[in-house]
């Protein structure tokens, strides 16, 4: 589930596939976990 979420964010941001934690750091997903 977390991996799928990371992939979803990757598709939206056009960034390489990062691990879930890295994705959160790179992308402010609007869920309060973004940097």
Curated annotation (Swiss-Prot):
<dbReference type="GO" id="GO:0004623">
    <property type="term" value="F:phospholipase A2 activity"/>
</dbReference>
<keyword id="KW-0629">Postsynaptic neurotoxin</keyword>
<comment type="function">
    <text>Snake venom phospholipase A2 (PLA2) that is the first competitive blocker of nicotinic acetylcholine receptors (nAChRs). Competes with alpha-bungarotoxin for binding to nAChRs and acetylcholine binding proteins (AChBPs) and blocks acetylcholine-elicited current. PLA2 catalyzes the calcium-dependent hydrolysis of the 2-acyl groups in 3-sn-phosphoglycerides.</text>
</comment>
<protein>
    <recommendedName>
        <fullName>Phospholipase A2 bitanarin</fullName>
        <ecNumber>3.1.1.4</ecNumber>
    </recommendedName>
</protein>
<comment type="similarity">
    <text>Belongs to the phospholipase A2 family. Group II subfamily.</text>
</comment>
<comment type="subunit">
    <text>Monomer.</text>
</comment>
<keyword id="KW-0964">Secreted</keyword>
<keyword id="KW-0378">Hydrolase</keyword>
<dbReference type="GO" id="GO:0090729">
    <property type="term" value="F:toxin activity"/>
</dbReference>
<dbReference type="GO" id="GO:0005576">
    <property type="term" value="C:extracellular region"/>
</dbReference>
<keyword id="KW-0800">Toxin</keyword>
<keyword id="KW-0528">Neurotoxin</keyword>
<keyword id="KW-1015">Disulfide bond</keyword>
